[in-house]
Amino acid sequence: IRQAESITDKYPTTGFKRATINNHQYDTNLRSCTVFSLFPDKSDRSIVGIESRAEKVKLNQRIVSQTSLALIDFIREYGFTITEREHWELLSYEETQKSTWHADNGAPHPCLVSMVYYLNDDYEGGEVEFKDHIGTPFKPSAGDLLIFPSSVDYVHRVLPITSGRKYAAISFCK
């Protein structure tokens, strides 16, 4: 995903909005990163170096092409029936930003499978930790794709960034 890396490297603070939790509420104690959607909507502007709706679609498709085979393998291995995959969103975590313990499936956002595609690894902190399954934080590398069930059995968090800026793309399947 070199294209996404070069875009975020060139414009690291432009166009991201505060990330929300349930019902579009802001709570920086629970989730303090910023986000922008790769969903091509009518309000598109020049954000993060993406000058047009077509460029947004192209970047989303590029991420899809680089992650689809792994998703198909996961679905087959664990027997999920997927009817929809959401467009990818890019997340940016700056120093001290984090997300606390949570499951990705819940009202008003029902989903079955969560995907996180890591775009860089030139930061410190920001490890992913699963409460009951791994027990130790996981430090992803650029290009890693983490796929897991969105259920309460996979409660997880992102530890605070201690230096640098972390970029990841996320998507959910229903």
Regions of interest found by a model, annotated:
Residues 1-78:
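Non-heme Fe(II)/2-oxoglutarate
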Residues 53-174:
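Catalytic core of non-heme Fe(II) oxygenases with the double-stranded beta-helix
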